[in-house]
Amino acid sequence: MSRRLPVYILIDTSGSMKGEPIESVKVGLSDMIASLRLDPYALETACISIITYDREVKQILPLTELENLQLPEIVCPDAGPTHTGAALNFLCDCYDREVNMGSREQKGDWMPLLFLMTDGKPADLMVYNEAIKRVKQHQFTNIVACAAGPKAKTEPLKKLTDNVFTLDTMDSSTFKKFFQWVTINVQQGGRTMGISEQTELPAPPAEVNLVV
């Protein structure tokens, strides 16, 4: 079996994402999968996992090769908190279980990519701060955090990664541009793995703003 490039996507599904925002995310994800399937490098290496989090955290898609991937339904509750800390702990459990670290005889998977999207701030801040320490004990090629919409707070995300981006609006065209950019990140990861430990992020589109 060829070495996999695990891609973990964490999506905030708290009550405020209900309606157009989550529907737009679904369209963006669907377009991303379709684009990646057309890329021979991505098709050979990329495996996608989707974890949703609100009051509960669920891995709605375990790490799956693109050719076998069917996007599951993503549902938001009518209301509820954003347990980002619980989501990060859950992610680390999935990483420990799913990512092949390799052995002296056999190379393991490439270091995963992590994309986290939220439209708010962690409701479980103490858990979140502890979970960040745990995430940093795991190796990722890149961690990208996206703060979507006017109520999203970037300060907590900056503790997790330097790669924090904002989306000013939460409409379908903005999410589409964001997921097109995620697609390019995954494609680039598939091509540059083994050449360098950390890949440079491609330039984002105008709708996706880097937080300095």
Regions found by a protein language model. Give the residues of each.
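Short beta-strand-loop
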Residues: 44-75, 154-160
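Acidic/polar low-complexity segments with low predicted structural confidence
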Residues: 1-3, 67-68
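Short, well-ordered amphipathic alpha-helices
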Residues: 29-37, 89-100, 129-132
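VWA/integrin I-like adhesion module and closely mimicked acidic/polar interface patches used
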Residues: 102, 120-159
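Von Willebrand factor
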Residues: 2-61, 69-110, 113-117, 142-156, 167-177, ...
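Short glycine-/polar-rich loops that comprise or flank the Walker A/P-loop
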Residues: 4-5, 111, 139-142, 161-163
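Von Willebrand factor A/integrin I-like adhesion domains
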Residues: 56, 150-201, 205-207
